[in-house]
A protein has these predicted regions:
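Glycine-rich FAD pyrophosphate-binding loop
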Residues: 11, 23-52
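N-terminal FAD cofactor-binding segment of flavoenzymes
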Residues: 46-85
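A structural signal for isolated positions on well-ordered beta-strands in alpha/beta enzyme cores
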Residues: 9, 32-34, 81, 131
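Short alpha-helical segment within the catalytic ATP-binding CA
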Residues: 19
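Beta1/beta-strand and adjacent pyrophosphate-binding region of the FAD-binding site
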Residues: 2-16, 34
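A structural micro-motif
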Residues: 31, 71, 128-130
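Conserved N-terminal helical subregion
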Residues: 75-152
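Active-site acidic short loop of glycosyltransferases
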Residues: 5-6, 30, 145-147
Length: 152
């Protein structure tokens, strides 16, 4: 690969890197953006991936909605209780108190990952300068240059 210059290089194809790439492409479709991804190219290879739940804030949902990347299956968080056993004090928040539908959401990592990959594929069709490179430990990326590098 000869020297390639990008506006943004995103190192990491997990949910944060995918969301960053999709949002940047949606806002700046002509930008030269590269996503370096160690995950398999084929979504079917991720079907049995990590099924643990992760908690996302309401703000994360709003961002993911803007790039059409909200998974269909999630559980809403209605109440948060923060305390330390044997210590004085606690914090308790409810969705009713804050006048929100939910304080956050629990989503399977695999579901958000696959939904973001699908959303990015749809967005990248309008971005002629997007470069999604699936890499491994043998891939040489030393010839890439960028104005901004995101480690995600």
């Amino acid at each position: 690969m000869s020297e390639i210059n990008f506006d943004i290089v995103i190192q990491g194809g997990g949910p944060v890197g995918l969301a960053c790439a999709a949002w940047c492409l949606q806002k700046f479709p002509e930008a030269k953006i590269a996503l370096l991804d160690r995950n398999p190219v084929d979504d079917a290879d991720l079907a049995t991936a990590d099924s643990r739940g992760i908690a996302l804030s309401h703000g994360s949902k709003l961002l993911l909605d803007t790039i059409n990347a909200w998974p269909t299956e999630c559980a809403d968080i209605h109440r948060v209780h923060v305390s330390q056993a044997g210590r004085f004090g606690r914090a308790l928040m409810t969705r009713e108190e804050l006048k929100q539908d939910a304080l956050g959401h629990i989503i399977r990592y695999r579901d958000i990952h696959l939904t973001l990959r699908k959303a990015l594929r749809a967005i990248q069709t309008n971005s002629p300068n997007f470069f999604w490179k699936h890499i491994d430990t043998q891939t040489n990326t030393s010839d890439l240059q960028a104005k901004c590098v995101v480690h995600a």
